Amino acid sequence: MNQLYNGMPAALMGGIVWRKSHFSNPSGNCVELAELPDGRVAMRNSRDPEGPALIYTRGEADAFVRGVKSGEFDDLIT
């Protein structure tokens, strides 16, 4: 596997299993996440599956998910 870096094309991340929320839009407009072999977490837009992926440490991903769960971003979608 190539060295994984922030912003790299997701298409070059061979062998990565992408997951999305069960609450996601069935038409494919979703945020997808994947665990990388080194434990980091990659994020991509399902509308552009070969496009750039953002890569976060586990701590960064954990802080984001906790913020989502606690409603910190609700004002952006309501």
Map each language-model feature to its residues.
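Positively charged, low-complexity terminal tracts
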Residues: 1-78
